[in-house]
UniProtKB/Swiss-Prot annotation:
Interacts with the RNAP. Has a higher affinity for the core RNAP than for the holoenzyme. Its ATPase activity is stimulated by binding to RNAP. A motif (DEAH box) lies at residues 280-283. Belongs to the SNF2/RAD54 helicase family. RapA subfamily. It comes from Escherichia fergusonii (strain ATCC 35469 / DSM 13698 / CCUG 18766 / IAM 14443 / JCM 21226 / LMG 7866 / NBRC 102419 / NCTC 12128 / CDC 0568-73). NCBIfam families: PRK04914.1 (NF003426). ATP binds at D177, E178, V179, G180, L181, G182, K183, T184. This is RNA polymerase-associated protein RapA. Transcription regulator that activates transcription by stimulating RNA polymerase (RNAP) recycling in case of stress conditions such as supercoiled DNA or high salt concentrations. Probably acts by releasing the RNAP, when it is trapped or immobilized on tightly supercoiled DNA. Does not activate transcription on linear DNA. Probably not involved in DNA repair. The gene is rapA. One of its GO terms (molecular function) is ATP binding. Residues 164-334 form the Helicase ATP-binding domain. SUPFAM superfamilies: P-loop containing nucleoside triphosphate hydrolases.
């Protein structure tokens, strides 16, 4: 390779260095200085990864002084080039610019510039780039974008709510599903959609302190959303980095107590410009017209500053009318300002609910009923739809569904409130209780007596808590090394149960981590039982590994021993046997325990085993939960209310379990109260709201559509190709799982989402649900999205050369494959990609400008081509450069028509959809005050900005491939 001092070259492997200058040459090496970075590189002359920079007539070049020149002639003397042409700033002609004075910051970014500069990519990278463009564009156009990537079962009612709310501008809604129906998942789905589409960028989640880690885990494991947990320590640290500590993170979780405890902190939260606020357990925010609580006022203040608000709460019937009104008031204080007026409105919705029930029943409608429906809907031209609904035609069912939808749009709080009940959702298992009464060991009896004497001054509540866990009382006196498990009959029973049910996966829950750890040691040492442990002292990764070991069918752990806090947010529905080694203090925690297995999609009835010690608080509590509340075998929406009402009496019985006088009466009263409250709740159910929240056939179709997309084999092929080219090692572990690890030759040194130790992935939703250590890979997973960004944001694969062996064509025939991208630039919040994502347009031109792309499909053509090494490729490019220039000009002339057609189609679609949505909401606003003015304003503003952005849409050449025909 002939090198001369002063020549300009560019590095093939480090193009970001800009133009290099030859500053030293000897027999074996050459040294290049890259002035823009001040760095030197020493290369072997015989095989240096550099390309000579040579411009041609017609090119525009820049001098190191910054002025530009159109090249008209190129002269070479002693190996050095001089460019002659016209300056663009002064229009002076005949200007000479020696190559040594070229601008050193020059980087070849256009595909044609890279090709002519000899920066030729591997052929497989060009193919990957085109596929990345194609699939990326297709994914933006998918109707359920944002709903496919989460690690959740495809449950229709959850998808229905998320699909409805997630597409809205700044949604402000109340999610009030019954316990176990997945409010957290619904909220996560809405967040995922809003963040993925760009509708939201900053999110604040406020939860009770005990649920912070549960939310942190759920958001990361299910939705790949990495939230930061803010407590006093984190807040203090962040104050060093920013005036407002909350500006240091985009996604934040904090407790309600943390938010309201400090006035300055609350001000910082309000000023942090969140897009979405999520509040869990919102029913604990106490409100009355005269005296709202500090917690309620804190959330009210935040809700005034944050555009989107999701409140997760108990069902309206559990809350009571006034408390329910207080939640709605947080969402829209202008609409819900008068409680008495709200109560009156609710009464007026009964006829609407009756009308919906009438339509769904499928019976013939009388003329009076048809007239009533027409009046309620209040639309012109409704008559044909009413007639269709009342006919025997095939369209009758769809007409009735449309009428139901119109009724629900126009009446009630269905736009701001979503509520599903277990009665309305199928797929829940039965729950069967097995109680095992065991004698109280003498060691515990002695410890309890001594504790009673020494702890006489303790409160009844403290004594009650102690009595629930006799092993801890024993350890207080005997020390931490006391071997309580040697005589506790629950341990013997547990070992016997596990050894006789070796084939069953069993979840064992106890209150404390220490108990779980001690039980694991006993089971392992005495019976060789494989038991995983799960407690709050473990990191998320350690818990993942424990959960994965438990999930393994053949070689996995038979038992998972969980502490109360450690198991929050984790579900193990592949197991159906649960042992409660002790009992939790309140009914909410009991339901949370059972909820680890009692989920939609659980395939078997749940067997709940409760070994309890007689004459302890456990024996009191097991009876109260089962006989008083029926809380083991059914969900208990009344539990907390009754618990609060009998708290003092219950505590006394727990603190003194041997004094049982009157306990039977307490249980009887609780059962009567439970039945009465349950009947009251059932009577107050809002059927109209249930129908709307459930989604019916529409929701079922949504779930089926996403399930079909789960089987997309294009994703697997693309992902494997992507990982190969990035340089990620893949090790197939069987069971639809692959381990990815970084290699020594990565395209980038640190690939986002891939740790040094590697990660386990699966493309199978069922495997991902069973194996929490395996990440569920979809088009929406950060690993794929980061890979797409890496390829498409740089110049990987943007220029290449291939050989086509085809004896039907003359040797030396040239074809140029051009990949144009039609796109529009706009803020992410406009979600312009719904209408015009960056869309590839492929052209395959011969030297006469004939476009053969329609006749020659990309993948078929790609398989017929052979790669060319870089050295040969550079020679070929230099030989045919003029011809390629000519073909490029023909391509530029042809692309406009195709691009304009895409842009016009996008404009028409955007105008039609956004105008229709605006018209629909404006019409509904007349009859349903739950449609906010700011929502209408936002849609109109969004429509105008979208149309303006599409007017500015354009196109550019993204990649090209030069193809030369050969017969060899």
């Amino acid at each position: 390779m002939p090198f001369t001092l002063g020549q300009r070259w560019i590095s093939d492997t480090e193009s970001e260095l800009g133009l290099g200058t030859v500053v030293a040459v000897d027999a074996r090496t050459v040294t290049l200085l890259f002035p823009s970075t001040g760095e030197n590189r020493l290369y072997a002359r015989s095989d240096s990864p550099v390309t000579r920079v040579m411009f041609n007539p017609g090119d525009t070049i820049t001098s190191h002084d910054g002025w530009q020149m159109q090249v008209e002639e190129v002269k070479e003397e002693n190996g050095l080039l001089t460019y002659i042409g016209t300056r663009l700033d002064t229009e002076e002609s005949g200007v000479a610019l020696r190559e040594v004075f070229l601008d050193s910051k020059l980087v070849f970014s256009k595909p044609q510039d890279r090709l002519f500069a000899g920066q030729i990519d591997r052929m497989d990278r060009f193919a990957l780039r085109y596929r990345a463009r194609k699939y990326s564009s297709e994914q933006f156009r998918m109707p359920y974008s944002g709903l496919r990537g989460q690690r959740t079962s495809l449950i229709p009612h959850q998808l229905n709510i998320a699909h409805d709310v997630g597409r809205r501008h700044a949604p402000r809604v109340l999610l009030a599903d019954e316990v176990g129906l997945g409010k957290t998942i619904e909220a996560g789905m809405i967040l995922h959609q809003q963040l993925l589409s760009g509708a939201a960028e900053r999110v604040l989640i406020i939860v009770p302190e005990t649920l912070q880690h549960q939310w942190l885990v759920e958001m990361l494991r299910r939705f790949n959303l990495r939230f930061a947990l803010f407590d006093d320590e984190r807040y203090a640290e962040a104050q060093h980095d920013a005036y407002n500590p909350f500006d240091t993170e985009q996604l934040v979780i904090c407790s309600l107590d943390f938010a309201r405890r400090s006035k300055q902190r609350l001000e910082h939260l309000c000023e942090a410009e969140w897009d979405l606020l999520v509040v869990d357990e919102a029913h604990h925010l106490v409100w009355s017209e005269d005296a709202p609580s500090r917690e309620y006022q804190a959330i009210e203040q935040l809700a005034e500053h944050v555009p989107g608000v999701l409140l997760l709460t108990a069902t309206p019937e559990q809350l009571g009318m006034e408390s329910h009104f207080a939640r709605l008031r947080l969402l829209d204080p202008n609409r819900f300002h008068d409680f008495a007026q709200f109560v009156e409105e609710q009464k007026n919705y009964r006829p609407v609910a009756d009308a919906v029930a009438m339509l769904l029943a499928g019976n013939k409608l009388s003329n009076d009923e048809l007239n009533m429906l027409g009046e309620m809907i209040g639309e012109q031209d409704i008559e044909p739809l009413l007639q269709a609904a009342n006919s025997n035609s095939e369209d009758a069912q769809s007409a009735r569904q449309e009428l139901v939808s119109m009724l629900m749009d126009r009446h009630g709080t269905s736009r701001v409130l979503f509520r599903n009940t277990r009665n309305g959702v199928k797929g829940f298992p039965k729950r069967e209780l097995h109680t095992i009464k065991l004698p109280l060991p003498t060691q515990y009896q002695t410890a309890i007596k001594v504790s009673g004497i020494m702890g006489a001054r303790k409160s009844a509540e403290d004594r009650a808590r102690d009595m629930l866990y006799p092993e801890r009382i024993y350890q207080e006196f005997e020390g931490d090394n006391a071997t309580w498990w040697n005589f506790d009959p629950r341990v013997e029973w547990l070992m016997g149960y596990l050894t006789s049910h070796r084939s069953q996966k069993v979840l064992v829950i106890c209150a404390k981590a220490a108990t779980a750890l001690q039980l694991e040691q006993v089971l392992r040492e005495r019976e060789g039982i494989r038991a995983a442990v799960f407690h709050e002292g473990m990191s998320i990764i350690e818990r993942d590994r424990a959960a994965a070991w438990f999930a393994e069918e053949d070689t996995g752990a038979q038992v998972l021993l969980c502490s109360e806090i450690g198991s929050e947010g984790r579900n193990f529905q592949f197991a159906s046997h649960m042992v409660m080694f002790d009992l939790p203090f309140n009914p909410d925690l009991l339901e949370q325990r059972i909820g680890r297995l009692d989920r939609i999609g659980q395939a078997h009835d749940i067997q709940i085993h409760v070994p309890y010690l007689e004459k302890t608080a456990q024996s009191v509590l097991v009876r109260w939960y089962h006989e008083g509340l029926d809380a083991f075998e059914h969900t208990c929406p009344t539990g907390r209310t009754i618990y609060d009402s009998v708290y003092n009496d219950l505590i006394n019985y727990l603190a003194s379990p041997d004094q049982t006088e009157g306990f039977d009466d307490l249980i009887k009263n609780c059962r009567e109260q439970h039945e009465a409250l349950k009947a009251q709740l059932e009577q107050g159910r809002d059927r109209l709201l249930e129908i709307h929240s459930n989604g019916g056939e529409k929701a079922q179709a949504l779930a089926e559509s996403i399930e079909e997309q789960d089987d997309d084999t294009n994703l697997i092929a693309f992902a494997m190709n992507l990982f190969d080219i990035i340089g990620i090692n893949q090790d197939d572990r069987g069971d639809n799982m692959i381990v990815l690890t970084p290699s020594d030759h990565m395209l980038v040194p640190d690939f986002p989402g891939l740790s040094e130790d590697g990660i386990t992935i699966t493309f199978d939703r069922e495997v991902a649900l069973a194996r929490e250590d395996a990440q569920f890979i979809t088009w929406e997973h950060p690993l794929i999205r980061n890979g797409l960004d890496l390829i498409l944001s740089g110049d990987t694969g943007s220029s290449t050369i291939s050989l086509l062996k085809n004896k039907a064509l003359p040797v030396g025939t040239l074809l140029v494959e051009l990949i144009y991208v039609v796109e529009a630039q706009a803020p992410k919040q406009l979600q312009l990609n719904r209408f015009l994502p960056p869309t590839p347009v492929r052209m395959l031109l011969d030297k006469n400008g004939n476009n053969l792309a329609a006749q020659v499909e990309f993948e078929t053509f790609n398989r017929q081509l052979n790669a060319v090494n870089r050295h040969t490729g550079s020679k070929l490019v230099n030989a045919v450069q003029q011809d390629v220039h000519a073909i490029l000009q023909l391509g530029e002339a042809q692309i406009e028509k195709s691009a304009r057609a895409l842009i016009d189609a996008a404009r028409n679609e955007a105008d039609e959809k956004l105008s229709a949505e605006l018209s629909r909401l404006e019409a509904l606003r007349a009859v349903n005050p739950n449609i906010r003015d700011d929502e209408l304003t936002a849609i109109e503003s969004n429509r105008q900005q979208v149309m303006e952005s599409l007017d500015q849409a354009g196109w550019r050449l993204d990649a090209l491939r030069l193809i030369v025909v050969t017969h060899q």
